[in-house]
């Protein structure tokens, strides 16, 4: 069994994928022949020192040699990775892959659109609207790009100086920027989804134990933030989060894996975003939440590969 482990990526979360690759590769190569396909920041595919490109049933180099694979795992996050772009190339090459279809990946990548879907399903969300650089904005607020992950380009604004910085930072990445109320006191909860062969698991809620403030990129991947694999919440809150997650997954057409993020303010739950390719670093919460339900990484891949082949 040969699996292409695709990592890196052209987008802003390149380094996150690299960390996940370092964690996953030694685990996978115990059970599979792993073809490490690296995508550089220019969007070029590499197999070791050879440039390759997706072709029918595998990857080909410029000499015409084809490296066949049985399936692929696109360990890519955010723009140009989790948004259906690479998945489209795999689909065109008839390479079975783990994760969402290109259409679903593109849909789930846009926070504003997914919030509208959640609202239509009766799932509470924070009020959000798209803004331009010249809009009048009431303070305090929270500003973030609509199509990026890992909190890239996102920031709080409590005064005019912070507002100008947040706007400049967000619009550096995209013209599609959203504004939300600023929650000074909140808990950040996550629910993991795992689905194969018509059976679905929604994990108990986990929690990001941020030390106050904003859970930004450096906090997520700098090793300073603590997490709880099982959040200390009431059974009612836990079940409600799983219920909301199930509604979203069904409506959006998510398959295989995802992580659904929520805010908890007092007893009020607010949907935040969905990630169709959760992190797989050593610190990542998603694989640990699955492990709490008896699904470690080797078993996860065995079940996922069995679902697509």
Q: Where is each model-derived feature located?
A:
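Glycine-rich phosphate/pyrophosphate-binding beta-alpha loops
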Residues: 78, 151, 211, 275-289
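Active-site "cap" helix and flanking loop/linker of ATP-utilizing ligase/carboxylase catalytic domains
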Residues: 207-258, 285-309
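Active-site nucleotide/adenylate-binding loops and adjacent lid/helix of ATP-dependent enzymes
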Residues: 1-7, 11, 22, 105-185, ...
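Conserved metal-phosphate-binding beta-hairpin within the catalytic cores
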Residues: 249-282, 290
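Phosphate-binding site of ATP-dependent enzymes
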Residues: 160-243, 264, 268-270
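ATP-binding N-terminal substructure of ATP-dependent carboxylate-amine bond-forming enzymes
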Residues: 1-103, 109, 113
């Amino acid at each position: 069994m040969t699996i292409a482990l695709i990592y890196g990526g052209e987008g802003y979360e390149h380094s996150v994928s690299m960390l996940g690759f370092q964690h996953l590769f030694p685990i996978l190569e115990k059970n599979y022949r792993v073809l490490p396909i690296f995508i550089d920041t220019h969007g070029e595919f590499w197999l070791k020192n050879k440039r390759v490109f997706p072709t029918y049933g595998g990857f080909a180099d410029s000499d015409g040699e084809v490296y066949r694979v049985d399936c692929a795992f696109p360990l890519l996050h955010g723009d140009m990775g989790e948004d259906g772009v690479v998945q489209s190339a795999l689909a065109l090459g008839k390479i079975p892959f783990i994760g969402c279809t290109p259409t679903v990946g593109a849909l789930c990548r846009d926070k504003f659109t997914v919030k509208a879907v959640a609202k239509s399903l009766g799932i509470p969300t924070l009020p959000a609207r798209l803004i331009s650089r010249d809009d009048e904005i009431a303070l305090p607020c929270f500003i973030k790009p609509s199509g990026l992950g890992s909190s890239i380009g996102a920031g709080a604004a409590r005064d005019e100086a912070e507002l100008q910085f947040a706007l400049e930072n967000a619009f550096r990445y995209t013209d599609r920027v959203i504004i939300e109320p600023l929650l000074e006191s909140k808990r950040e909860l996550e629910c993991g989804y795992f689905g194969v062969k018509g059976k679905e698991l929604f994990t108990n809620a986990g929690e990001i134990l941020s030390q106050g403030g904003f859970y930004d990129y450096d906090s997520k991947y700098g090793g300073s933030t603590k997490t709880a694999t099982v959040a200390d919440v009431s059974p009612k809150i836990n079940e409600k989060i799983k219920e909301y997650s199930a509604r979203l997954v069904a409506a959006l057409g998510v398959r295989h894996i995802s992580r659904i993020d929520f805010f908890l303010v007092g007893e009020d739950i607010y949907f935040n975003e969905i990630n169709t390719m959760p992190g797989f670093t050593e610190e990542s919460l998603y694989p640990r939440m699955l492990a709490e339900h008896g699904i470690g990484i080797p078993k996860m891949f065995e079940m996922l590969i069995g679902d697509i082949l």
